[in-house]
Amino acid sequence: MYKLVLIRHGESQWNLENRFTGWHDVDLTDTGVAQAKTAGQLLKDAGFTFDQAYTSVLLRAIKTLNIALEEMGQHYLPVERHWRLNERHYGALTGLDKAETAAKHGEEQVKIWRRSFDIPPPAVEDDSEHFPGHDPRYNNVDADILPRGESLKLTIERVLPYWHDVIRPDIQAGKRVIIAAHGNSLRALVKYLDGMSDEEVLGLNIPTGVPLVYELDENLKPISKEYLGDADAIKAMMDAVAKQGQAK
């Protein structure tokens, strides 16, 4: 049996401001820092230790991982950062206020952009500040495969090769793994691990800064999964995520 821990980054500044964030690099809020510390303490209290950590190349996920590991006394852990674990790219919606966008375009349209499986948001142009090709951290990535805007389906197609090629072999080799990433890159992994349908995943909301613990069999099929922390508080956080696209 293997154990795998997934954690969405703590609250970011644009989470707080209810903006579409995607690949834009924003920092954690004070609440987000506190969530990361709490996550680390919960994992420590539950007796977790890790051999390998994975995260995206975005500050909010990197910082969440570092803070949690420091709380556990495992700040020395090997960490691999990769763009394939980044958040879904929100295209031309990046930076827009979700509630204002819903008021302008209608809640149903924003729900389609946020929660449909295979409909991407409007794409950014290559000369946009939000096109990843202008960011030096992606210099070694072919510009043709960098996203201009992604649906959840496209995000899954980006994330899963990294799971199969890198993370899965480490787990099967006996390494204890933690992944700190983002709402949609983690939805991609949860959908795959749980065998969720395209329709089922639309209702999946992942709270910020809460460790999700999987027990997996020898084929990496889930035996069990649970969030660490107060169940009522976690449900409230999930409900808040679901309501982000509503007009004020």
UniProtKB/Swiss-Prot annotation:
Record GO biological process: gluconeogenesis; glycolytic process
Key words, A-Z: Gluconeogenesis, Glycolysis, Isomerase
Function of the molecule: Catalyzes the interconversion of 2-phosphoglycerate and 3-phosphoglycerate.
Record: active site: 9, 87
Subunit and partners: Homodimer.
Site (Transition state stabilizer): 182
Binding site for substrate: 8-15, 21-22, 60, 87-90, 98, 114-115, 183-184
Family: Belongs to the phosphoglycerate mutase family. BPG-dependent PGAM subfamily.
Catalytic activity: (2R)-2-phosphoglycerate = (2R)-3-phosphoglycerate
Known pathway: Carbohydrate degradation; glycolysis; pyruvate from D-glyceraldehyde 3-phosphate: step 3/5
Key word Isomerase present: yes
Gene Ontology molecular function, alphabetical: phosphoglycerate mutase activity
EC number annotated for this UniProt entry: 5.4.2.11
Organism of origin: Alteromonas mediterranea (strain DSM 17117 / CIP 110805 / LMG 28347 / Deep ecotype)
Cross-referenced CDD domains: HP_PGM_like
Highest taxon of the lineage: Bacteria
Protein name, UniProt field: 2,3-bisphosphoglycerate-dependent phosphoglycerate mutase
